[in-house]
């Protein structure tokens, strides 16, 4: 039986990968890091501070990830974790060289769709070999009958990036490039965010990979920067949480217009360590749905918790203290590998 089986973002969770903060660092400043992550924060890539995150940040985050894993285990979920890796090691191709980033966000580089798991062609050079952290798991899933695909490795030359372009146009269409976290699963409908972490060719490649069973919906002018899971959050069939600073009547994906849309309330700014945060305050709506009536939510976001409870959701309140520093909340820091239902939904 395939150990990979996921059709959407809400069916009861059976197996999940929880990331690790061990060894996390800001990679060497290069054109990819500047264009994708920091073009709006610094005038040149030379200004970007790189190197290891403070030990305190990593220690506290790893402890909180352990708590998350333990709580999910109590709920009967099988939890898998990557082992430690040396992210300071050099990564080199004929076109460039850099060092690594982290394995904190398995959501960013692996996409599970049905019984298929896909290694996506990520936008940052520092994440070029990130899937190696999960190689043993991928082999195990493959042995169980899962379909294992790896997108063509992008060259990620300087031509792939336009750091001086407006936000949303800094990743060019030289070749298919996208992070898995640019995708949300709604049964046979896949929402694909066209942004600085996912280009048009990436959407075209994904459609060819998943075949005619699925429809990839490229969403443009929804959110310019990286990843979609703090912009639109599916809670259960027919109910979606949206970011009021990004989603409006004009850019709401057509296939979601019939859904009940609840607007995320103002969030608590949890702060960050260092000169610049890696993500905005909206990381507070980056939640993990465990089943249609239960979600893991940042305990500090009390207004959001009350809103979810009002709409019939129970909440498991946990905390990732440094989510703005490291760039990921509970959805980012996990990858759902298997959910109970075998039914696919088409809306």
Swiss-Prot record:
- Catalysis performed (reactions): 1-amino-1-deoxy-scyllo-inositol 4-phosphate + L-arginine = 1-guanidino-1-deoxy-scyllo-inositol 4-phosphate + L-ornithine
InterPro entries under this entry? Answer: AmidinoTrfase
Active-site residue numbers: 179, 227, 332
- Pathway listed for it? Antibiotic biosynthesis; streptomycin biosynthesis
Q: Which SUPFAM superfamilies match?
A: Pentein (SSF55909)
Reported EC number(s) for this entry are 2.1.4.2
Q: Which GO terms describe its molecular function?
A: glycine amidinotransferase activity; scyllo-inosamine-4-phosphate amidinotransferase activity
Mind telling me which residue stretches traverse the membrane in this protein?
Answer: none
| The protein's enzyme class | transferase
Keyword terms, alphabetized: Antibiotic biosynthesis, Streptomycin biosynthesis, Transferase
Q: Which GO terms describe its biological process?
A: creatine biosynthetic process; streptomycin biosynthetic process
Which PANTHER family does this entry report, sorted A to Z?
Answer: GLYCINE AMIDINOTRANSFERASE, MITOCHONDRIAL (PTHR10488:SF1)
Subunit:
Homodimer.
- Annotated function: Catalyzes two non-consecutive transamidination reactions. It converts scyllo-inosamine 4-phosphate into N-amidino-scyllo-inosamine 4-phosphate and N1-amidinostreptamine 6-phosphate into streptidine 6-phosphate.
UniProt similarity note: Belongs to the amidinotransferase family.
Q: What is this protein called?
A: Inosamine-phosphate amidinotransferase 1
Q: Which organism is it from?
A: Streptomyces griseus
């Amino acid at each position: 039986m395939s150990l990979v089986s996921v059709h959407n973002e809400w069916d009861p969770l059976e197996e999940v990968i929880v990331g690790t903060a061990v060894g996390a660092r800001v990679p060497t400043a290069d054109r990819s890091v500047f264009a994708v992550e920091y073009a709006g924060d610094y005038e040149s890539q030379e200004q970007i501070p790189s190197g290891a995150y403070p030990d305190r940040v990593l220690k506290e985050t790893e402890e909180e990830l352990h708590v998350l894993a333990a709580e999910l285990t109590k709920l009967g979920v099988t939890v898998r974790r990557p082992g430690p890796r040396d992210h300071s090691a050099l990564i080199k191709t004929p076109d460039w060289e850099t060092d690594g980033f982290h394995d904190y966000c398995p959501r960013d580089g692996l996409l599970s769709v049905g019984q298929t798991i896909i290694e996506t062609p990520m936008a940052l050079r520092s994440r070029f070999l990130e899937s190696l952290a999960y190689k043993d798991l991928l082999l195990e899933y493959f042995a169980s009958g899962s379909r294992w695909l790896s997108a063509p490795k992008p060259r990620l030359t300087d031509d792939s990036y336009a750091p001086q372009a407006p936000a949303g146009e800094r990743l060019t269409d030289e070749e298919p490039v996208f992070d898995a976290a640019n995708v949300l699963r709604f049964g046979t409908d896949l929402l694909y965010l066209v942004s600085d972490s996912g280009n048009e060719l990436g959407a075209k490649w994904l459609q060819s990979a998943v075949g005619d069973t699925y429809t990839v919906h490229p969403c443009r002018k929804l959110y310019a920067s990286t990843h979609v899971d703090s912009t639109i959050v599916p809670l259960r069939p027919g109910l979606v949480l949206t970011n009021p600073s990004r989603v409006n009547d004009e850019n709401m994906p057509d296939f979601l217009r019939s859904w009940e849309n609840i607007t995320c309330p103002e969030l608590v700014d949890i702060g960050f360590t260092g000169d610049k945060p890696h993500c905005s305050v909206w990381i507070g709506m980056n939640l993990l749905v465990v089943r249609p009536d239960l979600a893991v939510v940042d305990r500090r976001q009390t207004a959001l918790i009350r809103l979810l409870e009002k709409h019939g959701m129970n909440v498991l309140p946990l905390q990732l203290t440094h989510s703005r520093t490291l760039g990921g909340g509970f959805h980012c820091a996990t990858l759902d590998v298997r959910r109970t239902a075998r039914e696919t939904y088409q809306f």
